[in-house]
Swiss-Prot record:
This is GTPase Era. InterPro entries: G_ERA_dom (IPR030388), GTP-bd (IPR006073), GTPase_Era-like (IPR005662), KH_dom-like_a/b (IPR015946), KH_dom_type_2 (IPR004044), KH_sf_prok-type (IPR009019), P-loop_NTPase (IPR027417), Small_GTP-bd (IPR005225). Belongs to the TRAFAC class TrmE-Era-EngA-EngB-Septin-like GTPase superfamily. Era GTPase family. GO terms for molecular function: GTP binding; GTPase activity; ribosomal small subunit binding; small ribosomal subunit rRNA binding. Residues 203-280 form the KH type-2 domain. The gene is era. Pfam families: KH_2, MMR_HSR1. Monomer. Residues 151-153 are annotated as: G5. GO terms for cellular component: cytosol; plasma membrane.
Amino acid sequence: MTEHKSGFVSIIGRPNVGKSTFVNRVIGHKIAIMSDKAQTTRNKIQGVMTRDDAQIIFIDTPGIHKPKHKLGDYMMRVAKNTLSEIDAIMFMVNVNEDIGRGDEYIMEMLKNVKTPIFLVLNKIDLVHPDTLMPKIEQYQSYMDFTDIIPISALEGLNVDHFIDVLKSFLPEGPKYYPDNQISDHPEQFVVSEIIREKILHLTSEEIPHAIGVNVDRMIKEDEDRVRIEATIYVERDSQKGIVIGKGGKKLKEVGKRARRDIEMLLGSKVYLELWVKVQRDWRNKVNFIRQIGYVEDQD
């Protein structure tokens, strides 16, 4: 009988290297928020990948960055604490970029970790194959890795091969989650992240990190329709105007795009109602940060 492998794998890396894209690719559903703006992942997103011979729980940690407020401090603590809880570490980098200070900081942090560490060179679809070996050698000069795998999370290139390699290093174990469970977050959290993603896509650089989303109400009205009421929080009146847009046009577009993804997630029709409220300096208010879902694990 074939042994069953299971384990927890942390994905760590600088902002925008493709961690969320990878999680969504291997899970087959949108669990982690994707955007071209930095620091879009705020919580540990546990995506559960179940195969006949293995179950891997991927923890998509916030991108490593220098904190600028209490929410940033929280994001960094989540990233570092995750390393002590897992069976393997994926250190993901953008192969199309030079090694930066953030990469060096992460490698310094990983040097004393005993867990298997895989260097995953993402975005190989953007570079010539001849550039891969020099980049690999650069990273190897900093530290030893359990294995080094080039992939494209967006295109799916070499992702299955990486999963096979990863499985070989995981311990034998049971299924921690049912076959049909793809995340340990409640549906409301995933819904709020989908709404936040659409705002990130549609607003300018000043807005994204001032955005918080809370699902106030989510009820099944009948067999094939779910009613969702959510509040979008910003820090300034000017930001509220940007999110709403002229004549409410931008907010309507946010709702339209979010509704489409939420209906795919829930498998039913969705009535989505959105409000925008100003909560001044909310990223420095610990109680409010907890209130809208960014809560550290309790021991």
